[in-house]
Amino acid sequence: MPCVADWLNNPFSIVQGIFAQNTPNSDWEKKVTDYFKEKLKENNATNWVPSLNDVPVHYLKPNSLVKFRCMVQDMFDPEFYMGVYETVDPNTNARVLHFGKYRDVAECGPQQEIDMNSSQTVTLERQTFYCVPVPGESAWVKEYLFSLQARVSPSTSYTPSRHKRSYEEDEDMEQHPSKQKEQHMGSGGDSHGCGEPKRLETEASAGHHLISPNCSPPLDLNFPLPGEKGPACLVKVYESWDTFKVNDVLEVYGILSVDPVLSIVNSEERDSSMLDPMECMDTAEEQRVHSPPSSLVPRIHVILAHKLQHLNPLLPACLNEEESKTFVSNFMSELSPVRAELLGFLTHALLGDSLAAEYLILHLISTVYARRDVLPLGKFTVNLSGCPRNSIFTEHIYRIIQQLVPASYRLQMTIENMNHSRFIPRKDYTANRLVSGILQLASNTSLVIDETQLEQGQLDTKGVHNVKALGNLITWQKVDYDFSYHQMEFPCNINVLITSEGRSLLPSDCQVQLQPQIIPPNMEEYMNSLLTAVLPSVLNKFRIYLSLLRLLDYSISDEVTKAVEEDFVEMRKNDPESITADDLHRTLLVARFLSLSAGQTTLSRERWLRAKQLEALRKARLQQQKCVNGNEL
Protein backbone atom coordinates (compact mmCIF):
# COMPACT_ATOMS: atom_id res chain seq x y z
CA MET A 1 0.00 0.00 0.00
CA PRO A 2 1.24 3.54 -0.70
CA CYS A 3 2.48 5.40 2.34
CA VAL A 4 1.51 8.92 3.38
CA ALA A 5 4.45 10.39 1.48
CA ASP A 6 3.20 8.80 -1.77
CA TRP A 7 -0.26 10.30 -1.88
CA LEU A 8 0.90 13.62 -0.43
CA ASN A 9 4.31 14.10 -2.06
CA ASN A 10 3.81 12.18 -5.27
CA PRO A 11 0.10 11.89 -6.11
CA PHE A 12 1.02 11.29 -9.76
CA SER A 13 2.39 7.88 -8.76
CA ILE A 14 -1.04 6.98 -7.33
CA VAL A 15 -2.84 8.26 -10.43
CA GLN A 16 -0.37 6.43 -12.71
CA GLY A 17 -0.90 3.17 -10.81
CA ILE A 18 -4.69 3.40 -11.06
CA PHE A 19 -4.47 4.42 -14.73
CA ALA A 20 -2.14 1.52 -15.55
CA GLN A 21 -4.43 -1.02 -13.86
CA ASN A 22 -7.50 0.13 -15.77
CA THR A 23 -8.15 0.60 -19.44
CA PRO A 24 -8.63 4.24 -20.43
CA ASN A 25 -12.25 3.55 -21.28
CA SER A 26 -13.06 2.33 -17.77
CA ASP A 27 -13.87 4.42 -14.71
CA TRP A 28 -10.23 4.98 -13.72
CA GLU A 29 -10.90 8.68 -13.12
CA LYS A 30 -13.62 7.90 -10.57
CA LYS A 31 -11.28 5.44 -8.86
CA VAL A 32 -8.70 8.22 -8.49
CA THR A 33 -11.16 10.60 -6.81
CA ASP A 34 -12.52 7.78 -4.63
CA TYR A 35 -8.98 6.89 -3.51
CA PHE A 36 -8.15 10.43 -2.39
CA LYS A 37 -11.61 10.88 -0.87
CA GLU A 38 -11.02 7.85 1.35
CA LYS A 39 -7.50 8.99 2.25
CA LEU A 40 -8.77 12.40 3.36
CA LYS A 41 -11.40 10.78 5.60
CA GLU A 42 -8.66 9.29 7.77
CA ASN A 43 -8.07 10.92 11.15
CA ASN A 44 -6.74 14.48 10.69
CA ALA A 45 -5.69 13.64 7.13
CA THR A 46 -7.00 16.93 5.75
CA ASN A 47 -4.59 18.74 8.09
CA TRP A 48 -1.64 16.79 6.72
CA VAL A 49 -2.16 18.39 3.32
CA PRO A 50 -0.14 21.62 3.05
CA SER A 51 -2.30 24.69 2.49
CA LEU A 52 -1.48 27.39 -0.03
CA ASN A 53 -3.16 29.81 2.38
CA ASP A 54 -0.48 29.09 5.00
CA VAL A 55 2.67 27.92 3.23
CA PRO A 56 4.49 30.11 0.67
CA VAL A 57 4.43 28.49 -2.74
CA HIS A 58 8.24 28.34 -2.96
CA TYR A 59 8.24 26.02 0.09
CA LEU A 60 5.87 23.55 -1.54
CA LYS A 61 7.04 20.61 -3.57
CA PRO A 62 5.94 20.85 -7.21
CA ASN A 63 3.38 18.22 -8.23
CA SER A 64 2.53 17.47 -4.59
CA LEU A 65 -0.97 17.41 -3.12
CA VAL A 66 -2.06 20.78 -1.72
CA LYS A 67 -5.26 22.41 -0.54
CA PHE A 68 -6.57 25.93 -1.01
CA ARG A 69 -9.42 27.75 0.71
CA CYS A 70 -10.62 30.35 -1.74
CA MET A 71 -13.39 32.32 -3.43
CA VAL A 72 -14.13 31.94 -7.13
CA GLN A 73 -13.42 35.45 -8.44
CA ASP A 74 -13.81 34.64 -12.14
CA MET A 75 -14.46 31.73 -14.47
CA PHE A 76 -12.51 31.53 -17.69
CA ASP A 77 -13.63 29.84 -20.90
CA PRO A 78 -13.40 26.02 -20.91
CA GLU A 79 -10.19 24.63 -22.37
CA PHE A 80 -9.38 21.40 -24.17
CA TYR A 81 -6.61 19.05 -23.10
CA MET A 82 -5.33 15.59 -24.04
CA GLY A 83 -6.98 13.34 -21.48
CA VAL A 84 -5.23 10.26 -22.90
CA TYR A 85 -2.40 10.26 -25.44
CA GLU A 86 0.08 7.76 -26.89
CA THR A 87 3.85 7.97 -27.21
CA VAL A 88 5.97 5.96 -29.61
CA ASP A 89 9.67 5.05 -29.54
CA PRO A 90 10.98 5.65 -33.11
CA ASN A 91 13.70 3.00 -32.67
CA THR A 92 11.64 0.11 -31.28
CA ASN A 93 8.18 1.30 -32.33
CA ALA A 94 7.04 0.53 -28.74
CA ARG A 95 3.87 2.39 -27.80
CA VAL A 96 2.82 3.60 -24.32
CA LEU A 97 -0.43 5.17 -23.20
CA HIS A 98 -0.30 8.16 -20.82
CA PHE A 99 -2.89 10.23 -18.96
CA GLY A 100 -2.96 14.01 -19.44
CA LYS A 101 -5.34 14.74 -16.61
CA TYR A 102 -3.97 16.91 -13.77
CA ARG A 103 -1.11 18.12 -16.01
CA ASP A 104 -0.26 21.37 -17.75
CA VAL A 105 2.22 19.74 -20.13
CA ALA A 106 2.30 16.28 -21.64
CA GLU A 107 5.09 13.97 -20.49
CA CYS A 108 7.19 11.63 -22.57
CA GLY A 109 10.50 9.84 -22.14
CA PRO A 110 13.78 10.95 -23.76
CA GLN A 111 13.42 8.38 -26.57
CA GLN A 112 9.69 8.91 -27.08
CA GLU A 113 7.53 11.10 -29.25
CA ILE A 114 3.85 11.87 -28.92
CA ASP A 115 1.80 10.38 -31.72
CA MET A 116 -0.57 13.23 -32.47
CA ASN A 117 -2.49 11.04 -34.95
CA SER A 118 -3.01 8.09 -32.63
CA SER A 119 -6.51 6.65 -32.53
CA GLN A 120 -6.03 6.26 -28.75
CA THR A 121 -5.91 10.04 -28.19
CA VAL A 122 -8.84 11.33 -26.15
CA THR A 123 -9.50 15.07 -26.10
CA LEU A 124 -11.39 16.28 -23.03
CA GLU A 125 -12.52 19.57 -21.54
CA ARG A 126 -11.77 21.25 -18.23
CA GLN A 127 -12.82 24.50 -16.61
CA THR A 128 -10.45 27.10 -15.14
CA PHE A 129 -11.49 29.19 -12.14
CA TYR A 130 -9.51 32.23 -11.07
CA CYS A 131 -9.54 31.96 -7.29
CA VAL A 132 -8.45 34.36 -4.55
CA PRO A 133 -8.33 34.02 -0.74
CA VAL A 134 -11.67 34.75 0.95
CA PRO A 135 -12.00 38.58 0.84
CA GLY A 136 -11.88 40.16 4.28
CA GLU A 137 -11.23 36.87 6.06
CA SER A 138 -10.61 37.61 9.74
CA ALA A 139 -7.16 37.19 11.27
CA TRP A 140 -8.51 34.74 13.88
CA VAL A 141 -9.75 32.42 11.11
CA LYS A 142 -6.33 32.41 9.45
CA GLU A 143 -4.58 31.87 12.78
CA TYR A 144 -6.85 29.00 13.78
CA LEU A 145 -6.43 27.20 10.44
CA PHE A 146 -2.67 27.75 10.58
CA SER A 147 -2.51 26.32 14.11
CA LEU A 148 -4.19 23.13 12.88
CA GLN A 149 -1.72 22.93 10.01
CA ALA A 150 1.35 23.52 12.15
CA ARG A 151 0.20 21.08 14.83
CA VAL A 152 -0.55 18.11 12.61
CA SER A 153 1.35 18.51 9.35
CA PRO A 154 4.23 15.99 9.09
CA SER A 155 7.61 17.20 7.90
CA THR A 156 7.25 15.01 4.81
CA SER A 157 4.31 17.03 3.50
CA TYR A 158 6.45 19.76 1.98
CA THR A 159 10.09 20.59 1.45
CA PRO A 160 11.30 23.87 2.97
CA SER A 161 13.59 24.81 0.10
CA ARG A 162 13.29 27.32 -2.66
CA HIS A 163 14.22 25.03 -5.57
CA LYS A 164 16.69 27.74 -6.38
CA ARG A 165 17.70 26.62 -9.85
CA SER A 166 14.12 26.32 -11.05
CA TYR A 167 13.23 29.72 -9.65
CA GLU A 168 16.18 31.40 -11.36
CA GLU A 169 15.11 29.86 -14.65
CA ASP A 170 11.59 31.11 -14.07
CA GLU A 171 12.95 34.53 -13.17
CA ASP A 172 14.85 34.86 -16.42
CA MET A 173 11.84 33.82 -18.45
CA GLU A 174 9.29 36.05 -16.76
CA GLN A 175 11.34 39.29 -16.58
CA HIS A 176 9.07 40.79 -13.97
CA PRO A 177 10.12 43.72 -11.77
CA SER A 178 12.41 42.72 -8.92
CA LYS A 179 9.96 43.77 -6.21
CA GLN A 180 7.30 41.49 -7.64
CA LYS A 181 9.79 38.64 -7.79
CA GLU A 182 10.64 39.01 -4.13
CA GLN A 183 6.99 39.02 -3.10
CA HIS A 184 5.89 36.08 -5.18
CA MET A 185 8.90 33.77 -5.50
CA GLY A 186 7.82 30.47 -6.97
CA SER A 187 9.36 27.05 -7.40
CA GLY A 188 10.00 25.08 -10.50
CA GLY A 189 8.90 21.59 -11.30
CA ASP A 190 10.70 18.32 -11.86
CA SER A 191 11.11 17.19 -15.45
CA HIS A 192 9.92 13.64 -14.72
CA GLY A 193 12.69 12.17 -16.84
CA CYS A 194 11.71 14.12 -19.91
CA GLY A 195 13.84 16.65 -21.75
CA GLU A 196 12.23 20.05 -22.18
CA PRO A 197 12.27 20.03 -26.01
CA LYS A 198 10.13 16.87 -25.89
CA ARG A 199 7.43 18.43 -23.71
CA LEU A 200 4.27 19.51 -25.40
CA GLU A 201 1.31 21.46 -24.07
CA THR A 202 -1.75 19.42 -23.27
CA GLU A 203 -3.96 22.44 -23.90
CA ALA A 204 -5.46 23.26 -27.25
CA SER A 205 -6.89 26.63 -28.20
CA ALA A 206 -10.25 26.37 -26.46
CA GLY A 207 -10.34 29.98 -25.44
CA HIS A 208 -6.71 30.88 -24.63
CA HIS A 209 -3.06 29.82 -24.84
CA LEU A 210 -0.45 29.75 -22.12
CA ILE A 211 1.54 32.79 -23.18
CA SER A 212 3.29 35.22 -20.85
CA PRO A 213 4.54 38.37 -22.61
CA ASN A 214 7.99 39.59 -21.67
CA CYS A 215 8.62 42.97 -20.04
CA SER A 216 5.02 43.27 -18.95
CA PRO A 217 3.92 45.53 -16.09
CA PRO A 218 3.35 44.01 -12.63
CA LEU A 219 0.49 41.54 -12.60
CA ASP A 220 -2.73 42.70 -10.93
CA LEU A 221 -3.91 39.75 -8.82
CA ASN A 222 -7.45 41.16 -8.95
CA PHE A 223 -8.32 40.96 -5.25
CA PRO A 224 -11.77 42.50 -4.53
CA LEU A 225 -10.63 44.41 -1.41
CA PRO A 226 -7.71 46.85 -1.23
CA GLY A 227 -4.71 45.76 0.82
CA GLU A 228 -5.49 42.04 0.62
CA LYS A 229 -2.60 39.57 0.60
CA GLY A 230 -2.21 35.91 -0.23
CA PRO A 231 -1.94 33.70 -3.29
CA ALA A 232 -4.18 33.80 -6.32
CA CYS A 233 -4.48 30.50 -8.19
CA LEU A 234 -5.73 29.14 -11.46
CA VAL A 235 -7.86 26.22 -10.33
CA LYS A 236 -8.40 23.60 -13.04
CA VAL A 237 -11.65 21.69 -12.44
CA TYR A 238 -12.37 18.40 -14.19
CA GLU A 239 -15.67 17.20 -12.73
CA SER A 240 -19.01 18.85 -11.87
CA TRP A 241 -17.77 22.38 -12.53
CA ASP A 242 -21.32 23.47 -13.34
CA THR A 243 -22.20 23.06 -9.63
CA PHE A 244 -19.91 25.99 -8.75
CA LYS A 245 -20.47 29.67 -9.47
CA VAL A 246 -18.69 33.01 -9.13
CA ASN A 247 -18.29 34.12 -5.47
CA ASP A 248 -18.65 30.57 -4.10
CA VAL A 249 -16.15 29.75 -1.35
CA LEU A 250 -14.41 26.44 -2.04
CA GLU A 251 -11.93 24.16 -0.37
CA VAL A 252 -10.02 22.38 -3.11
CA TYR A 253 -7.55 19.51 -2.94
CA GLY A 254 -5.39 19.05 -5.98
CA ILE A 255 -1.97 18.74 -7.57
CA LEU A 256 0.21 21.85 -7.48
CA SER A 257 1.71 22.96 -10.78
CA VAL A 258 4.39 25.67 -10.67
CA ASP A 259 6.45 24.40 -13.59
CA PRO A 260 8.59 27.12 -15.26
CA VAL A 261 8.48 25.09 -18.48
CA LEU A 262 5.05 26.68 -19.01
CA SER A 263 6.81 29.99 -19.59
CA ILE A 264 9.30 28.36 -21.99
CA VAL A 265 6.59 26.68 -24.04
CA ASN A 266 4.48 29.79 -24.24
CA SER A 267 7.33 32.13 -25.10
CA GLU A 268 8.57 29.78 -27.83
CA GLU A 269 5.06 29.34 -29.17
CA ARG A 270 4.60 33.09 -29.40
CA ASP A 271 8.02 33.91 -30.83
CA SER A 272 8.33 31.09 -33.36
CA SER A 273 5.06 32.03 -35.10
CA MET A 274 4.20 28.37 -35.47
CA LEU A 275 0.55 29.25 -34.96
CA ASP A 276 -1.37 30.92 -37.72
CA PRO A 277 -2.11 34.45 -36.44
CA MET A 278 -5.66 34.04 -37.72
CA GLU A 279 -6.10 31.03 -35.45
CA CYS A 280 -4.85 32.83 -32.34
CA MET A 281 -7.58 35.29 -31.54
CA ASP A 282 -6.44 36.11 -28.00
CA THR A 283 -5.07 39.57 -27.30
CA ALA A 284 -1.71 39.94 -25.57
CA GLU A 285 -3.53 41.25 -22.51
CA GLU A 286 -5.84 38.22 -22.45
CA GLN A 287 -2.89 35.84 -22.77
CA ARG A 288 -1.13 37.65 -19.92
CA VAL A 289 -4.17 37.51 -17.62
CA HIS A 290 -5.22 33.95 -18.41
CA SER A 291 -1.69 32.52 -18.42
CA PRO A 292 0.33 34.39 -15.80
CA PRO A 293 3.74 33.04 -14.70
CA SER A 294 3.22 30.01 -12.49
CA SER A 295 5.56 31.45 -9.85
CA LEU A 296 3.11 34.32 -9.37
CA VAL A 297 -0.18 32.49 -9.94
CA PRO A 298 0.30 28.73 -9.41
CA ARG A 299 -2.05 26.17 -10.92
CA ILE A 300 -3.99 23.60 -8.90
CA HIS A 301 -5.37 20.60 -10.78
CA VAL A 302 -8.38 19.66 -8.69
CA ILE A 303 -8.92 16.10 -7.51
CA LEU A 304 -11.59 17.00 -4.94
CA ALA A 305 -13.48 20.25 -4.34
CA HIS A 306 -16.44 21.19 -2.22
CA LYS A 307 -18.37 24.38 -1.61
CA LEU A 308 -18.18 25.53 2.00
CA GLN A 309 -21.52 25.77 3.79
CA HIS A 310 -20.13 28.51 6.05
CA LEU A 311 -16.83 30.34 6.65
CA ASN A 312 -16.26 29.48 10.33
CA PRO A 313 -13.55 26.81 10.87
CA LEU A 314 -14.65 26.34 14.50
CA LEU A 315 -17.80 24.62 13.21
CA PRO A 316 -17.92 21.22 11.47
CA ALA A 317 -17.76 21.70 7.69
CA CYS A 318 -21.03 19.83 7.15
CA LEU A 319 -23.68 20.03 9.85
CA ASN A 320 -25.71 17.12 8.47
CA GLU A 321 -23.24 14.41 9.48
CA GLU A 322 -23.80 12.42 12.68
CA GLU A 323 -20.68 13.73 14.44
CA SER A 324 -21.73 17.28 13.59
CA LYS A 325 -25.18 16.74 15.10
CA THR A 326 -23.53 15.79 18.40
CA PHE A 327 -21.43 18.98 18.26
CA VAL A 328 -24.55 21.08 17.61
CA SER A 329 -26.63 19.48 20.36
CA ASN A 330 -23.80 19.88 22.90
CA PHE A 331 -23.40 23.55 22.04
CA MET A 332 -27.15 24.23 22.07
CA SER A 333 -27.34 22.87 25.61
CA GLU A 334 -25.16 25.76 26.85
CA LEU A 335 -26.61 28.42 24.55
CA SER A 336 -28.32 30.53 27.21
CA PRO A 337 -25.19 31.54 29.19
CA VAL A 338 -23.30 32.19 25.93
CA ARG A 339 -26.04 34.56 24.75
CA ALA A 340 -26.04 36.34 28.11
CA GLU A 341 -22.25 36.79 28.02
CA LEU A 342 -22.33 38.01 24.42
CA LEU A 343 -25.10 40.49 25.25
CA GLY A 344 -23.05 41.81 28.16
CA PHE A 345 -19.92 42.06 26.00
CA LEU A 346 -21.70 43.99 23.22
CA THR A 347 -23.50 46.19 25.77
CA HIS A 348 -20.11 47.31 27.10
CA ALA A 349 -18.85 47.83 23.53
CA LEU A 350 -21.90 50.01 22.79
CA LEU A 351 -21.20 52.15 25.85
CA GLY A 352 -23.78 50.52 28.11
CA ASP A 353 -26.66 50.47 25.58
CA SER A 354 -28.28 47.03 26.05
CA LEU A 355 -31.08 47.68 23.51
CA ALA A 356 -28.58 48.45 20.76
CA ALA A 357 -26.65 45.31 21.81
CA GLU A 358 -29.82 43.19 21.43
CA TYR A 359 -30.35 44.49 17.90
CA LEU A 360 -26.68 43.98 17.03
CA ILE A 361 -26.96 40.30 18.01
CA LEU A 362 -30.08 39.94 15.84
CA HIS A 363 -28.25 41.61 12.96
CA LEU A 364 -25.19 39.37 13.28
CA ILE A 365 -27.24 36.14 13.09
CA SER A 366 -29.41 37.35 10.21
CA THR A 367 -29.12 35.74 6.78
CA VAL A 368 -31.08 35.59 3.54
CA TYR A 369 -32.85 32.25 3.91
CA ALA A 370 -35.04 32.44 0.78
CA ARG A 371 -36.11 34.69 -2.09
CA ARG A 372 -39.71 35.37 -3.03
CA ASP A 373 -39.60 36.67 -6.60
CA VAL A 374 -37.03 39.49 -6.25
CA LEU A 375 -37.52 39.98 -2.51
CA PRO A 376 -34.74 38.57 -0.27
CA LEU A 377 -36.21 37.14 2.94
CA GLY A 378 -34.16 37.32 6.13
CA LYS A 379 -31.96 40.33 5.44
CA PHE A 380 -31.69 42.65 8.43
CA THR A 381 -29.63 45.76 7.72
CA VAL A 382 -29.27 47.84 10.89
CA ASN A 383 -28.52 51.58 10.92
CA LEU A 384 -26.86 52.39 14.24
CA SER A 385 -27.39 56.16 14.44
CA GLY A 386 -26.21 58.56 17.13
CA CYS A 387 -22.57 57.53 16.70
CA PRO A 388 -20.03 60.27 17.54
CA ARG A 389 -18.78 62.03 14.39
CA ASN A 390 -15.14 61.51 13.38
CA SER A 391 -14.58 59.42 16.49
CA ILE A 392 -12.56 56.25 16.92
CA PHE A 393 -15.75 54.68 18.35
CA THR A 394 -16.96 53.32 14.99
CA GLU A 395 -13.50 52.00 14.16
CA HIS A 396 -13.41 50.05 17.43
CA ILE A 397 -16.95 48.73 16.93
CA TYR A 398 -15.72 47.33 13.61
CA ARG A 399 -12.66 45.78 15.28
CA ILE A 400 -14.95 44.02 17.76
CA ILE A 401 -17.15 42.72 14.92
CA GLN A 402 -13.96 41.53 13.19
CA GLN A 403 -13.20 39.42 16.26
CA LEU A 404 -16.65 37.79 16.11
CA VAL A 405 -17.30 37.04 12.42
CA PRO A 406 -15.23 35.02 9.90
CA ALA A 407 -15.15 37.70 7.17
CA SER A 408 -15.78 41.44 7.21
CA TYR A 409 -14.90 44.78 5.62
CA ARG A 410 -15.17 48.37 6.86
CA LEU A 411 -16.16 50.80 4.12
CA GLN A 412 -15.38 54.38 5.09
CA MET A 413 -18.02 56.42 3.29
CA THR A 414 -15.96 59.46 2.34
CA ILE A 415 -16.45 61.55 -0.80
CA GLU A 416 -12.97 60.43 -1.90
CA ASN A 417 -13.81 56.74 -1.53
CA MET A 418 -17.22 57.04 -3.16
CA ASN A 419 -15.84 58.90 -6.18
CA HIS A 420 -12.69 56.87 -6.75
CA SER A 421 -13.21 53.31 -5.46
CA ARG A 422 -14.42 50.52 -7.72
CA PHE A 423 -17.46 49.00 -6.01
CA ILE A 424 -19.01 47.08 -8.90
CA PRO A 425 -17.11 44.30 -10.71
CA ARG A 426 -16.90 44.90 -14.46
CA LYS A 427 -16.09 42.78 -17.49
CA ASP A 428 -12.84 43.71 -19.23
CA TYR A 429 -13.38 42.44 -22.77
CA THR A 430 -9.79 43.19 -23.84
CA ALA A 431 -8.35 40.88 -21.18
CA ASN A 432 -11.50 38.71 -21.16
CA ARG A 433 -11.74 38.74 -17.39
CA LEU A 434 -13.99 40.00 -14.60
CA VAL A 435 -12.27 42.94 -12.90
CA SER A 436 -13.13 42.74 -9.21
CA GLY A 437 -14.83 45.40 -7.08
CA ILE A 438 -15.33 46.01 -3.36
CA LEU A 439 -18.84 44.52 -3.45
CA GLN A 440 -17.60 41.16 -4.79
CA LEU A 441 -17.79 39.44 -1.42
CA ALA A 442 -18.43 35.92 -0.15
CA SER A 443 -21.81 35.02 1.32
CA ASN A 444 -22.38 36.12 4.95
CA THR A 445 -19.55 38.64 4.92
CA SER A 446 -20.18 41.51 7.37
CA LEU A 447 -19.99 44.89 5.61
CA VAL A 448 -19.74 47.81 8.04
CA ILE A 449 -20.43 51.14 6.31
CA ASP A 450 -19.05 54.04 8.36
CA GLU A 451 -21.09 57.09 7.41
CA THR A 452 -19.62 59.19 10.23
CA GLN A 453 -16.67 59.79 7.88
CA LEU A 454 -18.90 61.55 5.32
CA GLU A 455 -18.06 65.21 4.82
CA GLN A 456 -19.49 67.91 2.56
CA GLY A 457 -18.59 67.54 -1.08
CA GLN A 458 -19.80 66.68 -4.56
CA LEU A 459 -20.38 63.13 -5.76
CA ASP A 460 -19.38 62.63 -9.38
CA THR A 461 -21.03 60.14 -11.75
CA LYS A 462 -19.01 57.23 -10.38
CA GLY A 463 -19.84 58.25 -6.81
CA VAL A 464 -23.56 58.35 -7.59
CA HIS A 465 -23.33 54.87 -9.17
CA ASN A 466 -21.50 53.58 -6.09
CA VAL A 467 -24.16 54.95 -3.72
CA LYS A 468 -26.84 53.36 -5.92
CA ALA A 469 -24.95 50.04 -5.81
CA LEU A 470 -24.88 50.15 -2.00
CA GLY A 471 -28.63 50.86 -1.96
CA ASN A 472 -29.33 47.92 -4.27
CA LEU A 473 -27.15 45.65 -2.15
CA ILE A 474 -29.04 46.62 1.01
CA THR A 475 -32.55 46.56 -0.47
CA TRP A 476 -32.37 43.64 -2.90
CA GLN A 477 -29.24 41.76 -1.77
CA LYS A 478 -27.86 41.84 -5.29
CA VAL A 479 -25.02 43.52 -7.16
CA ASP A 480 -25.43 44.42 -10.83
CA TYR A 481 -22.06 43.58 -12.42
CA ASP A 482 -21.10 45.83 -15.33
CA PHE A 483 -20.80 43.95 -18.60
CA SER A 484 -20.64 47.19 -20.67
CA TYR A 485 -23.50 46.31 -22.99
CA HIS A 486 -25.72 45.06 -20.20
CA GLN A 487 -25.82 44.51 -16.46
CA MET A 488 -25.92 41.06 -14.92
CA GLU A 489 -27.52 40.49 -11.52
CA PHE A 490 -25.47 38.55 -8.99
CA PRO A 491 -27.51 37.66 -5.87
CA CYS A 492 -25.62 38.02 -2.61
CA ASN A 493 -26.07 37.55 1.13
CA ILE A 494 -24.16 40.34 2.87
CA ASN A 495 -24.80 41.53 6.44
CA VAL A 496 -24.74 45.33 6.27
CA LEU A 497 -24.35 47.47 9.39
CA ILE A 498 -24.40 51.26 8.90
CA THR A 499 -22.92 53.52 11.58
CA SER A 500 -23.99 57.15 11.27
CA GLU A 501 -24.44 60.36 13.22
CA GLY A 502 -28.03 61.05 12.11
CA ARG A 503 -30.29 58.85 10.03
CA SER A 504 -28.32 57.15 7.25
CA LEU A 505 -28.50 58.34 3.65
CA LEU A 506 -28.75 54.66 2.73
CA PRO A 507 -31.83 52.47 3.20
CA SER A 508 -31.98 50.07 6.14
CA ASP A 509 -34.39 47.55 7.65
CA CYS A 510 -34.06 48.93 11.14
CA GLN A 511 -32.72 52.17 12.66
CA VAL A 512 -31.46 51.98 16.24
CA GLN A 513 -30.57 55.25 17.97
CA LEU A 514 -27.54 54.74 20.21
CA GLN A 515 -28.02 55.94 23.79
CA PRO A 516 -24.66 55.73 25.60
CA GLN A 517 -24.93 55.18 29.34
CA ILE A 518 -21.24 55.80 29.92
CA ILE A 519 -18.74 58.19 28.30
CA PRO A 520 -15.23 56.76 28.76
CA PRO A 521 -12.54 59.44 29.29
CA ASN A 522 -10.25 57.43 26.99
CA MET A 523 -12.26 55.64 24.29
CA GLU A 524 -9.31 53.74 22.83
CA GLU A 525 -8.19 52.42 26.19
CA TYR A 526 -11.77 51.44 27.08
CA MET A 527 -12.37 49.54 23.83
CA ASN A 528 -9.00 47.78 23.90
CA SER A 529 -9.57 46.61 27.47
CA LEU A 530 -12.86 44.99 26.40
CA LEU A 531 -11.13 42.54 24.06
CA THR A 532 -8.21 41.80 26.36
CA ALA A 533 -10.64 40.99 29.19
CA VAL A 534 -12.41 38.27 27.17
CA LEU A 535 -10.89 34.79 27.38
CA PRO A 536 -10.04 33.22 23.99
CA SER A 537 -12.30 30.26 24.83
CA VAL A 538 -15.22 32.64 25.45
CA LEU A 539 -14.52 34.49 22.19
CA ASN A 540 -14.64 31.16 20.36
CA LYS A 541 -18.04 30.44 21.90
CA PHE A 542 -19.29 33.81 20.64
CA ARG A 543 -17.98 32.97 17.16
CA ILE A 544 -19.63 29.55 17.10
CA TYR A 545 -22.88 31.02 18.46
CA LEU A 546 -23.18 33.65 15.71
CA SER A 547 -22.29 31.27 12.86
CA LEU A 548 -24.33 28.30 14.05
CA LEU A 549 -27.61 30.16 14.59
CA ARG A 550 -27.55 31.38 10.98
CA LEU A 551 -27.71 27.78 9.81
CA LEU A 552 -30.72 26.66 11.89
CA ASP A 553 -34.13 26.06 10.32
CA TYR A 554 -37.06 28.12 11.57
CA SER A 555 -40.83 27.86 11.30
CA ILE A 556 -44.06 29.37 12.64
CA SER A 557 -46.95 27.07 13.55
CA ASP A 558 -50.45 27.72 12.19
CA GLU A 559 -51.65 28.44 15.71
CA VAL A 560 -49.04 31.15 16.34
CA THR A 561 -49.54 32.57 12.83
CA LYS A 562 -53.22 33.06 13.57
CA ALA A 563 -52.44 34.69 16.94
CA VAL A 564 -49.95 37.06 15.30
CA GLU A 565 -52.48 38.06 12.64
CA GLU A 566 -55.13 38.79 15.27
CA ASP A 567 -52.61 40.74 17.32
CA PHE A 568 -51.62 42.83 14.30
CA VAL A 569 -55.26 43.61 13.46
CA GLU A 570 -55.71 44.80 17.04
CA MET A 571 -52.56 46.95 16.80
CA ARG A 572 -53.84 48.58 13.60
CA LYS A 573 -57.18 49.22 15.23
CA ASN A 574 -55.56 50.97 18.20
CA ASP A 575 -53.06 52.98 16.15
CA PRO A 576 -54.07 53.07 12.45
CA GLU A 577 -51.79 56.03 11.66
CA SER A 578 -48.41 54.62 12.62
CA ILE A 579 -48.77 50.81 12.36
CA THR A 580 -48.10 49.61 8.79
CA ALA A 581 -47.45 46.36 6.95
CA ASP A 582 -43.73 47.22 7.16
CA ASP A 583 -44.04 47.21 10.95
CA LEU A 584 -45.51 43.71 10.87
CA HIS A 585 -42.76 42.48 8.56
CA ARG A 586 -40.01 44.01 10.74
CA THR A 587 -41.52 42.70 13.99
CA LEU A 588 -41.75 39.21 12.47
CA LEU A 589 -38.07 39.48 11.50
CA VAL A 590 -37.13 40.59 15.01
CA ALA A 591 -39.19 37.71 16.44
CA ARG A 592 -37.47 35.25 14.08
CA PHE A 593 -33.95 36.27 15.09
CA LEU A 594 -34.93 36.65 18.73
CA SER A 595 -36.17 33.04 18.73
CA LEU A 596 -33.06 31.76 16.96
CA SER A 597 -30.81 33.74 19.32
CA ALA A 598 -32.32 31.71 22.17
CA GLY A 599 -31.90 28.45 20.25
CA GLN A 600 -35.62 28.12 19.49
CA THR A 601 -36.50 27.11 15.94
CA THR A 602 -40.22 27.93 16.23
CA LEU A 603 -41.93 31.16 17.25
CA SER A 604 -43.58 31.14 20.66
CA ARG A 605 -46.12 33.60 22.02
CA GLU A 606 -43.54 34.81 24.55
CA ARG A 607 -40.95 35.60 21.85
CA TRP A 608 -43.56 37.46 19.81
CA LEU A 609 -44.42 39.65 22.81
CA ARG A 610 -40.71 40.25 23.49
CA ALA A 611 -40.20 41.29 19.84
CA LYS A 612 -43.08 43.76 20.13
CA GLN A 613 -41.54 45.13 23.31
CA LEU A 614 -38.12 45.64 21.69
CA GLU A 615 -39.71 47.37 18.71
CA ALA A 616 -41.72 49.66 20.99
CA LEU A 617 -38.56 50.68 22.87
CA ARG A 618 -36.67 51.26 19.63
CA LYS A 619 -39.45 53.43 18.16
CA ALA A 620 -39.79 55.41 21.38
CA ARG A 621 -36.10 56.31 21.17
CA LEU A 622 -36.47 57.51 17.60
CA GLN A 623 -39.50 59.59 18.52
CA GLN A 624 -37.62 61.07 21.47
CA GLN A 625 -34.66 61.96 19.26
CA LYS A 626 -37.01 63.49 16.69
CA CYS A 627 -38.46 65.74 19.37
CA VAL A 628 -34.96 66.75 20.52
CA ASN A 629 -33.78 67.58 17.02
CA GLY A 630 -37.09 69.05 15.92
CA ASN A 631 -36.90 67.29 12.57
CA GLU A 632 -37.35 63.90 10.93
CA LEU A 633 -34.68 61.32 11.66
Curated annotation (Swiss-Prot):
InterPro entries: MCM_complex-bd. Residues 154-198 are annotated as: Disordered. It holds the Pfam family MCM_bind. Keywords: Cell cycle, Cell division, DNA replication, Mitosis, Nucleus. It comes from Gallus gallus (Chicken). One of its GO terms (cellular component) is nucleus. GO terms for molecular function: chromatin binding. Its main location: nucleus. This is Mini-chromosome maintenance complex-binding protein. It is found in: Nucleus.
